[in-house]
Amino acid sequence: LQFCHVLAMLFNLMIKIGYVPGAFSQSYTVPLLKDHCNAYVKSVSANDFRGISISPVISKVFEHCILERYGAFFVSSDYQFGFKKRSSCAHATYTLRCVIDYFVSRNSTVNLCAVDLSKAFDKMSHHGLFIKLMNRCIPVSLLRILEVWFERCTTCIKWGSCLSKFYKLNCGIRQGGVLSPYLFAVYVDSVIDKVRQCGAGCKINMASVGILLYADDILLVAPTVTALQTMLHVCETELSWLDMTINPAKSVCLRIGPNWKSTPVNISTLDGSDISWQQSCRYLGIHIVAGRVFSCSLDNAKRSFYRAFNAVYCKIGGVASEEVVLHLVKSKCMPLLLYGTEAIPIKKAQIRSVEYAITCCLMKLFKTKSKEIVCECMSFFNFCDFSTCVVRRKRKFLLKFVANFWRNELCCVFVDVAKAELNSLR
């Protein structure tokens, strides 16, 4: 027998008797510093790390098999953009942009609230998840497997070459597991339903577009401040049923539209904590700016690009050829500038600013102060300028958006907008 046949018999037997080996429930957790944190400051704390669980390979193969056979039971709302094939942060960002553009073009101001959850993945209730799965009429054999699996789940912390003692996980879900993101999406799916049912969010052609999710990143979109306050309370109430809490200190409100300069009273959580209005907020890696129309700041992207280029140049700039350094710049540095640009509008001034940053770095690489020489070198090494890269990314993204999302309950509203933008790029 081949190894795959042995695994198939083992997995079928496990599902039949509702049992998983003890090793399947064991993992070790590696703390990784969050993106916005700096490892070289003195104020780093445990809250600045995200734990990623490393599980046995065979258990991951089993999870893939479960997902292949029972994937229909783990389907989440169209308003959840995370953990789905052919769906990315760019799709969530583009949908948000289309919603805002729709209302701003009709002289309305859109009110946003980016809700931050406190340790959402770590606080997920196992019993609450089982209830939600039973409501979906999940097969008893699969439910029994998951119950045994979660009941015996243990992990330890790995720091460098040191391992801690194993301890039991009474709640939460392993970040890094194959099934984990799908189970979490099922768990928070009711938040979307409750917020949509309250009817306070933005609507386009009678379709509710008041809430967008990407994993545990929740964004509320409302036409008025009062409606935003109502949606926040509905969202918070449902989250409390799920044993989850909002972090007001990291949650942000933002206004985009004709009245964006008028600052209303802060909206508050159920316990009275205020969520302040800000001039910008970070959402899925991009920085949305309050203003008359939807726009994003590229300043953080430029700073990241400078850091990455200087790191590459300091390490190998004196020993490697220009071709090697330029290849690393193209593969490691340019993606920091291009991230999310396919989904957001970019002004000509922003393009000039970014291209100036790239030119300055290449002047340093080619040891020249002539812009013409840099342009010749870029052409010789087939290094595309920023504006060309953005147009290519936009065209590729919009083609996929139109092809894949016309059946999506939410995104189908904006397919015509995507087609019009695609035609303008040709």
Predicted segments, located by residue:
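Short, conserved micro-motifs composed of acidic
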Residues: 161, 245-280
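Active-site palm subdomain of RNA-directed nucleic acid polymerases
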Residues: 66-81, 183-219, 228
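Catalytic palm subdomain of template-directed nucleic-acid polymerases
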Residues: 119-136, 211-240, 257-258, 290-293
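Conserved pre-catalytic core of RNA-dependent polymerases
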Residues: 1-186, 190
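Structural motif
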Residues: 47, 56-57, 140, 177-179, ...
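Non-catalytic, peripheral interaction segments enriched in hydrophobic/basic residues
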Residues: 69, 215, 243, 247-259, ...
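Alpha-helical recognition domains of nuclear gene-regulatory proteins
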Residues: 10-13, 69, 73, 99-102, ...
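Acidic catalytic cores of enzymes that act on phosphate-bearing nucleotides/polynucleotides
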Residues: 370, 384-426
